[in-house]
Amino acid sequence: MPKMKTNRSAAKRFGKTGSGKFTRRRQNLRHILTKKSAKRTRRLGQGALVDSANVKAVSRLLPYA
């Protein structure tokens, strides 16, 4: 059986923690930032975990993560 391919776009967007959870970046931090408060932009700069509903899909895209 041939090797499975990693989805490269997903590999650039998601990471995996030591405990096996997937991390992601938050949205809304690219542009139109002037109307967003400093507190909000700080919070958006922190990473987040992938929701449990999407873990199976992400793990299929990243078979070797």
UniProtKB/Swiss-Prot annotation:
Family from the record: Belongs to the bacterial ribosomal protein bL35 family.
Name of the gene encoding the protein in the UniProt record: rpmI
Chain spans, region Disordered: 1-28
Species of origin: Solidesulfovibrio magneticus (strain ATCC 700980 / DSM 13731 / RS-1)
Molecular function GO terms recorded: structural constituent of ribosome
Keyword Nucleotide-binding in annotation: no
GO cellular component: cytosolic large ribosomal subunit
Protein name, UniProt field: Large ribosomal subunit protein bL35
Domain of life where this protein originates: Bacteria
PANTHER family in alphabetical order: 54S RIBOSOMAL PROTEIN BL35M (PTHR33343), LARGE RIBOSOMAL SUBUNIT PROTEIN BL35M (PTHR33343:SF1)
NCBIfam families in the record: rpmI_bact
